[in-house]
Each structure stands twice: as structure tokens, then as C-alpha cells.
């Protein structure tokens, strides 16, 4: 009895010492780090956060501690940046210091710092430079890719016509269309819309992405070192990510067997050729793992961002039929019904441009941004961020900054129109992030959004199962990404 009592006292004393050491360490750092709520050992600020509304939880904390504060997600120390001025100051004015990539635990299970999106330093720079050049070689930013988008838009319109006005969920209609554009670049060909393997890939992408937006996905961000070994929905996300990697690996192996170094067919071929050229370079970043995971980065990002934005956009246009009618009027006046829209038409279509920008602003697809990491001890305002500190640039707080948008919670294309009805840019329009690590697919995404939306709206009216006033446009999930509500709609020929 005495022995067990002594053991209990010893255990309590040991835990007390650990707690005191943790608090002391955190307080020691707080003289350099921005202020924030006091964390508990091991769990950090978990008890102060609503994992179902992580973005809103962090913004609520910023009301107390200001636009720069420190939060602990479990043992992860994060500096959170809110508002246009703060985010720009970090990502643009101190771009190099904030250019490291922070953690995204779900995707890090697979990527582990390889590929283009989740890497840092020289690897990220080399892969980014190569990817930008290679995408340009295959027509991105040129007439060639515009023709590819227009061709795919034609296939999409045909598939909508075949629904004969029935109510459908547009999710996979959109994702397979958008995915075929990036597929033609990275794989050299498009998929048939009914290809079962293709549809399986799209489900894997959507499933793994949706997990990151769930409450459990946010809990996993805090306790991944333990949860990756436990049963739960994270295991399904891992299975989906593994399935995507396996598919890309199979594609790469096929290209290896049929490669002509003098005639690259696609992004994979170009990377394989670069691997051959750098075979004797001991410091090369061009090897199989980076090829597979960079290709997956491009395939994933090139599919989900634009298709999810369009899906949210359709819902918003059904909610606000007067806005839909104005877009129809501008399309009829500038383009007419007898030719396909061209990307250059946007210069004469300020209202449509404003609507597309407002859809992106309202959708706010990556509200907390991709996490950054400071590359060295960094002085930021009155604080000192130790090398390796993770940073959340809250892109949603920029897209909803009341200094730039009069009614940031409302969907209103006037946010991007001047007094004369002409399109106006905004320094707070950052859906593709800003600075050195902005999304280099921005140009392609802008072209896709304009051409797909105008092609579809040139041919169809949108009809909801609900009256406009009853449509709820609140997101279904908000975590690492924003997931719009699930709905069905009808495409009625004009």
C-alpha cells in the first residue's frame, strides 16, 4: 500500500515538473512571439478551438489578440496572420523569410516534403521553375490551351444537354471536365467521361480533400503523430491518397517504357528527360519521387480548385437570379449565341469578370492558406519568430477584409465594379495567395473559370429545386479547404 502511494506521489510530481517546464518554456518564448491564449501541455489550445469552425475560431481569437497572434495546435506552434496589410507584409515584403512550407498533416502523410506544393528551399525553387516553364511549353498561357479548354467545354455542354433538364448533382460533371484540361498537359491525353478509373480518381481526390475540411481532419492536424496509427476516417483519406500515387506511378512507368527523349509528349516525359540530363548531378531534385508527387500536385490542384469554384458559383447564381440574368445579357450582347466565347472577350465583359471574382472571393477555397514556415529567425513587426516557426496566412481574412469590401459577408459583384460599371481590381483579391509562393496555375485557372462559365451560361439557364430565398449558400464544411453545400440543379436550354 505504501509502495503504491509513493509511486502515485512520484508520478504526480513528475507530471507537475513536466507541466511547469512546458509553461516556463512557452513563457520564455512569449517574449519573442506574438501574444495568444495560454496553451496546455500536450494539447495546446485544443480546448479553446471549435474544430468544426477552425477559421472562425481563429478569427475570434484575433479579435482579442490582434492581427498577429500565436496559437498551439497540440504541440505545433503557429503564428497566425490576419488582414490584408498583415498578410502582404509577410508574404510580399518579407517574401524570402516566409517562403518555407509549413505542415499539412493529411497530405504530408504521403508527400513528406517532396513534390512541388509541400516542399521548401532549393527543391521547391527548382521544381517550381521547371513546372512553370514546362506548362508554358505545353501551351499554358497561349492559344493552344484556350482551344483545349473550349474543346472540353463543348463536351461538357453536350453532357448537360443529355440530362434533358433533369435535376443532377453537377460535382463530377465539372470535376471530370476541368481535370481533362490538366490531364492533357501532364498525361498528354484526356479521359473519356465514363472511364471508371477516371471517376475513381476524382472520387479519391474529393474524398481526401473533404477529410481536411472536417472536424476530425482538424483534430488530425493537431495530433497526427498519434492518430496516423489509429483507426478512423484519416485511414480512408490515406487510402485515397495512396490510390492517387499508385495511378501516377503507373502512368510514369508507361511513359518510361515508351519515351522518346527528342519528342516529349507531356509533362511526365519532360521531367523524365530532365532526369536523364541530370543523372550525374548528385544534388539533383529531378528523380522519381519528385516526378510522381509533382505530377500528383498538378493533377490534384488543376482539378479541384476550378471545379469547386464553379460548383459554388452555380449555387450563388441560382440564389441571385438577377445576377444570372445580367451575365446572360452581357454574354448575348458581347458574344451572341453563334460562336464560342474567347478569353479576350473578358476585356469587354466587366460584369461577368466581376461576378467570377466575387464567386472566388465568396467561395474562399483555402481560408487559412497553405501553411508557411519562416526560413530563418525573422523579425516581424515587434516580434521575433524563431527559424522553423509555422505561419498561417489567413487568406480568408484578406478576402473578407472590410477595409476593401464594403459588405464582406454578402455576395455582391459590385465589390469589383467602379462607379461607371467597369471592372476594378482589388489588392485584397488573393484566392491564389501572393508573394513568391503564389499559385503559378493562376493564369490557367482564370482562363478556365471564364471560358467554362461563359460557355455554360451562353447555353443554359440554371434552375434549383428550391426558391431563391430558400437556398442556403453557407459552406458545408470549412477547414483546410471550404466545401460548398451539396445540391442538385437543372440545366435548361436557352
Curated annotation (Swiss-Prot):
Main localization, broad class: endoplasmic reticulum
Q: Which cofactor does it need?
A: heme
Presence of the UniProt keyword Zinc in the record: no
Detail which positions bind heme. Answer: 439
InterPro entries per UniProt: Cyt_P450, Cyt_P450_CS, Cyt_P450_E_grp-I, Cyt_P450_E_grp-I_CYP2A-like, Cyt_P450_sf, Cytochrome_P450_fam2
Instruction: List N6-acetyllysine occurrences by residue.
Output: 379
User: Can you quote a single GO CC term?
Assistant: endoplasmic reticulum membrane
Q: Which UniProt keywords apply?
A: Acetylation, Endoplasmic reticulum, Heme, Iron, Membrane, Metal-binding, Microsome, Monooxygenase, Oxidoreductase, Phosphoprotein
Reactions catalysed, as given in the entry: an organic molecule + reduced [NADPH--hemoprotein reductase] + O2 = an alcohol + oxidized [NADPH--hemoprotein reductase] + H2O + H(+)
Q: Which GO terms describe its biological process?
A: response to stilbenoid
Concerning PROSITE patterns, the annotation shows: CYTOCHROME_P450
Which Gene Ontology terms cover its molecular function? Answer: heme binding; iron ion binding; oxidoreductase activity, acting on paired donors, with incorporation or reduction of molecular oxygen, reduced flavin or flavoprotein as one donor, and incorporation of one atom of oxygen
Q: How does it sit in the membrane?
A: Peripheral membrane protein
Q: Which Pfam families match?
A: p450
Which body tissues produce this protein? Kidney and lung. Expressed in liver, with a strong circadian rhythmicity. Circadian expression is regulated by DBP.
Where is this protein localized, as stated in its record? Answer: Endoplasmic reticulum membrane; Microsome membrane
Something else the entry says is: There are only 11 differences between the sequence of testosterone 15-alpha-hydroxylase and that of coumarin 7-hydroxylase. By site-directed mutagenesis it has been shown that modification of position 209 is sufficient to convert the specificity of the two forms of the enzyme.
The record's family statement is: Belongs to the cytochrome P450 family.
Q: What is this protein called?
A: Cytochrome P450 2A4
Query: What is the organism field in this record?
Result: Mus musculus
